[in-house]
């Protein structure tokens, strides 16, 4: 009980509440007395400084400039780092506040995120200069010599990679593509002609 790191006497208590967003809360001392104010700068932690409600803590008491007692050098039992609100809980901890930020714009779904939605990967098929099949500049997917294409090859679906949005984003995204922007033969999978002109005997 007298692990005196800061010269004062270590006391024990439990966290009454702690607002992670605002960075402060109160501790109820085990030996009675008034609840003590605690600021996140007084927390001994590995990483994000927060406290979980009802968490057992040890601390020292200091009188602040307004002559009020406050808890400082707050740690877990036996001087261990506090557990805190590292996963969420009341307003957030590490993730919480804006955590995961994936929904709306960017980051996955929505407008222009990494793959889905309107802009998707290739800028929504808005005439970029790189081939959707192989990623090389200088030619379009329909003229690409790399395999793919065909009924489900390459980007999957009818036109595999070619077409409106090509491999990933945009309108036709890998799936329907084809039709609208050239693409490959449905019968043999080769580019440069349509199924009705195919000489490979598919139909």
From Swiss-Prot:
Every CSD domain range: 12-76
Region named Disordered: 65-127
Annotated GO MF terms: double-stranded DNA binding; mRNA binding; nucleic acid binding; single-stranded DNA binding; zinc ion binding
SUPFAM superfamilies associated with the record: Nucleic acid-binding proteins, Retrovirus zinc finger-like domains
InterPro entries, A to Z: CSD, CSD_CS, CSP_DNA-bd, NA-bd_OB-fold, Znf_CCHC, Znf_CCHC_sf
PROSITE patterns found in the cross-reference section: CSD_1, CSD_2, ZF_CCHC
Biased composition (Gly residues): 85-127
Tissue expression per record: Mostly expressed in shoot apices, seeds and siliques, and, to a lower extent, in roots, cotyledons, stems, shoots, leaves, floral buds and flowers. Present in shoot apical meristems and siliques (at protein level).
Protein name: Cold shock protein 2
Source species of the chain: Arabidopsis thaliana (Mouse-ear cress)
């Amino acid at each position: 009980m007298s692990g005196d790191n800061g010269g004062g006497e270590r006391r024990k208590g439990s966290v009454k509440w702690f607002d992670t967003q605002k960075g402060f809360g109160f501790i109820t001392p085990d030996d009675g007395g008034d609840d003590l104010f605690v600021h996140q700068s007084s927390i001994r932690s590995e990483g994000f400084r927060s406290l979980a409600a009802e968490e057992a803590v040890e601390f020292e008491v200091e009188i602040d400039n307004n002559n009020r007692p406050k808890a400082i050098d707050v740690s877990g039992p036996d001087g261990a780092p506090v557990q805190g609100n590292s996963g969420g809980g009341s307003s957030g901890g590490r993730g919480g506040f804006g955590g995961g930020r994936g929904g709306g714009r960017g980051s996955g779904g929505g407008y222009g995120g990494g793959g889905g939605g309107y802009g998707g990967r290739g800028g929504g098929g808005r005439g970029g200069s790189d081939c959707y099949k192989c990623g090389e500049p200088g030619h379009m997917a329909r003229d690409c010599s790399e395999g793919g294409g065909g009924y489900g090859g390459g980007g999957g679906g009818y036109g595999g990679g070619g077409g409106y949005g090509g491999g990933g984003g945009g309108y036709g995204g890998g799936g329907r593509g084809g039709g609208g922007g050239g693409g490959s033969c449905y019968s043999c999978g080769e580019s440069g002609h349509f199924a009705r002109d195919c000489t490979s005997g598919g139909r």
